[in-house]
């Protein structure tokens, strides 16, 4: 879960957007500018990223679920891979309006997808070729739209968003429901309303990979921590029982 300044530099986390596009609310996190490009202060970004990872780890250790969101072309593949590695839900293609605020309807679509997948595994020989084609097109669309959240049985306990400006609808829905937000915020967007701000480049594929990997690692560590606690609790109970039996025999 550790990330250092050198890794951030190599990933280009410090490169912001052109100065003319900046959001003044990001001023506290900007070091300066070079060739009309804002330079993000990594001495601010690093501890804030570490704080976000710490939150992700603690949330997961307490059985919480984090939804990872990154639908830009530079983020899709990485988001899907890292979320799958960490075993958490994700959105990598497009954010459907109401994905959170109308989750009841989304759950109906998830149920439909699972039923269709089961039907596909059982075989489609009983329906015509034309019906098979229609069936496959529907299942492909559902996989694309909600495939990453098909195992999400309830609203997430937090959302990690790469590029808050690109995912405004997701941000608004999370705020409306009071779901904590971890967000990568570049110099051209406002950090207001984001609970755990990560000031940084939101376009570089290397930077995106660093953020996604860090949060995924935090989730994995949090889950391992929770498992350790369970093992310790079970071991302690077993130890107590053993002592009682031994004393009784004496």
Curated annotation (Swiss-Prot):
Pfam families: Ribosomal_S2. Gene3D superfamilies: Glucose-6-phosphate isomerase like protein, domain 1, Helix hairpin bin. The keyword Ribonucleoprotein applies. It comes from the Bacteria. Keywords: Ribonucleoprotein, Ribosomal protein. GO terms for biological process: translation. GO terms for molecular function: structural constituent of ribosome. PANTHER family: 30S RIBOSOMAL PROTEIN S2 PROKARYOTIC AND ORGANELLAR, SMALL RIBOSOMAL SUBUNIT PROTEIN US2M. Belongs to the universal ribosomal protein uS2 family. This is Small ribosomal subunit protein uS2. It comes from Polaromonas naphthalenivorans (strain CJ2).
């Amino acid at each position: 879960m550790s990330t250092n300044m050198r890794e951030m530099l190599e990933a280009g986390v410090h490169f912001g957007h052109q100065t003319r596009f900046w959001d003044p609310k990001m001023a506290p996190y900007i070091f300066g500018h070079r060739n009309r490009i804002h330079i993000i202060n990594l001495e601010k970004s690093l501890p804030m990223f570490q704080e976000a990872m710490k939150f992700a780890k603690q949330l997961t250790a307490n059985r919480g679920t984090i939804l990872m969101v990154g639908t830009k072309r530079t983020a899709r593949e990485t988001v899907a891979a890292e979320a799958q590695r960490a075993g958490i839900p994700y959105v990598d293609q497009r954010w459907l309006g109401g994905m959170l605020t109308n989750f009841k309807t989304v759950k109906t679509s998830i149920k439909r997808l699972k039923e269709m997948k089961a039907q596909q595994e059982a075989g489609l020989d009983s329906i015509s070729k034309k019906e098979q084609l229609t069936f496959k097109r529907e299942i492909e669309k559902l996989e694309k739209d909600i495939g990453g959240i098909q195992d999400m049985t309830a609203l997430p306990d937090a959302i990690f968003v790469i590029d808050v400006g690109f995912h405004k609808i997701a941000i608004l829905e999370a705020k409306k429901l009071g779901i904590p937000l971890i967000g990568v915020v570049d110099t051209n967007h406002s950090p207001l309303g984001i609970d755990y701000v990560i000031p940084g480049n939101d376009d570089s594929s290397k930077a995106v990979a660093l953020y996604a990997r860090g949060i995924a690692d935090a989730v994995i560590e949090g889950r391992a921590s929770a498992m350790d606690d369970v093992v310790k609790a079970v071991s302690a109970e077993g130890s107590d029982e053993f002592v009682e039996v031994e004393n009784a025999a004496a």
